[in-house]
Amino acid sequence: MAFNHLPACVYDALAPLSVTPVTHSVPMAKNHRSDRPVPDPASRPSPGAVLGRLASGPSRAARITHTEHLPPRTGRHAIWPDRIRSEVIAAVQECGIEHPWAHQALAAEHALDGDSVVVATGTASGKSLAYLVPVLSTLLEGSRAPNGRGATALYLSPTKALAADQCRSVKELSQPLGTAVRPAVYDGDTPYEEREWVRQYANYVLTNPDMLHRGILPSHPRWSSFLKSLKYVVIDECHTYRGVFGSHVAQVLRRLRRVCARYGSSPVFLLASATAAEPAVAARRLTGLPVVEVADDTSPRGELVFALWEPPLTELHGEKGAPVRRTATAETADLLTDLTVQGVRSVAFVRSRRGAELISVIAQEKLAEVDRSLVQRVAAYRGGYLPEERRALERDLHSGQLLGLAATTALELGVDVSGLDAVVICGYPGTRASLWQQAGRAGRSGQGALAVLVARDDPLDTFLVHHPEALFDRPVESTVLDPDNPYVLAPHLCAAAAELPLTEADLELFGPACADVLPQLEAAKLLRRRTRAWHWTRRERAADLTDIRGGGGRPVQIVEEGTGRLLGTVDEAAAHSTVHEGAVHLHQGRTYLVRSLDLADSVALVEQAEPPYSTVARDTTAISVLETDTEIPWGAGRLCYGSVEVTNQVVSFLRRRLISGEVLGETKLDLPPRTLRTRAVWWTVTEDQLDEARINPEILGGSLHAAEHASI
């Protein structure tokens, strides 16, 4: 059955500012030493005071359905293991850190013992230092080798922004160590003329799983000197590796371990995770290795005031008689505006790239009515920007030039934002783990912080803001991934065979599902068995068989038609719904109209315009069951698990009037369907059961959709 997913109006009437303009801004302290003077904590607004001012306008107080106060926590120090080089300890002390927290010292001890370890503590608890200190100490030891690279380390980040930020931190921390530590980023933004230097001379390489999958492992002979000296693999923000993406990354790591063994190395894995359920179990599933867990957070924490915020009603009887609330997008933009006027450094998290752009634009427009000098202190931050734009935003955020930022989850991860006073979360992000990760971005210097969850106008968000115990009294979720998924495993077996012929001894590394998948790959003539090994048979690159993030295809370049200027990129899957012909595209406060989308050449041509409407794509999704592997009774129905094919197609787009959200018209689109074969869970019911539940055919689709949301 196919369903149409119609996002609610994303832009509506904007209420006037409800706070008195504040002419001073509050400087923020960095996590470590800063060139800027550190402010007196007493001069910073308390979280309660900030929330009080946000709620001081007419009807504002009634929008707060609950306020949770998390008390401050004192820290517990320890000493570094005596095997850490004194030069490294001195470098850490130069950054203003005299003693480690107990969990940092414990993690370093495990790393030096050769135990793979996962540090699963709260945001801003110093996880980076826990793995950096043993890594730097080992690199310093290795610098005595004749080639100066007797030890190397590989850092994996889920985003380019986090890798670039970590590279800055490593350079700052290791500066007193001279050239013994040579960190370098190796990703899609790295100029080609720099790549050879990284391969030959860098001993701390920061990259992402995508580059490891497509760039490093297929070219492993060019990385031989690096790989044979590889002592540590650091996997930052490992809780983000879940679902299909996490399953792909798990297989990429198995390929890495296999290639390392070919060069005689067996690296220790150091993982950093947000607070999660059973982090050691998830880390073992990800790496395929036994992993020690360090989860007792001994760092100090400032007070956190967490408010649940429900936007006001705009209509008592909207579509189909249901009441309608003001959109979370508009409400979040108001709060970001108010916080900026107060001089409170803030980030507003939103799920979509378009939402981040909208919140930024709305906030800038409202700030222009109060103080035009504040307009340039608010911006959007999302994926798809050009590297130079992204780096400039990160510099401005790091320096304090930006007061307010509307960001996607690209900033949810551990990029050092030098401490924030407040975080506004536009709609429940889907998991409690992600909610706490976003909320934890505030107060990173140990000071008090404010977090506000703004509810979207949907049943789940409404339930959560009126049942705070569902958020505050329940543990975070486990990280779920399935490396044995045959649709994930198959392309990685091909990639592994292309890197090095695949032997029987390798199959244990890749898991028991190999026995079923390998014959299928042989039948498809992708692999051929010769003597005692399987070989890749095609001319094309095996690593190109799969996109580990599930997007597929080449990134689509967004180009200004009149000038030929490249504005940014979007992955092919998202291009269908965001840069189709006729779409309104937002980029750093400017509005563009998409004139054409060429999927063959991966180019969307746009021109600057100011249409009086926004656009929303409509799509259909159909799921076909290919094979049922497991089926068990589940109440009156059946619960099933097996292989499915998912087909999605963008079929049209709506034009909605700005401010009111009124639908002006619908335009059909002729875009190709996209299919994905994967594994799924589904339940089945009979017509008799539907009749007993009094569900008639007209509401069946909506009922199933509601059941889907309830189950996840």
What are these regions (language model features)?
Residues 30, 54-95, 99-102, 106, ...:
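Helicase motor core with emphasis on the C-terminal RecA-like subdomain
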Residues 448-451, 457-472, 482, 492-503, ...:
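Extended Lys/Arg-rich polyanion-binding regions
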Residues 5-6:
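Short hydrophobic targeting helices and cationic amphipathic motifs
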Residues 39-64, 352, 588-597, 601-603:
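Structured, non-catalytic alpha/beta "coupling" segments that mediate domain-domain communication
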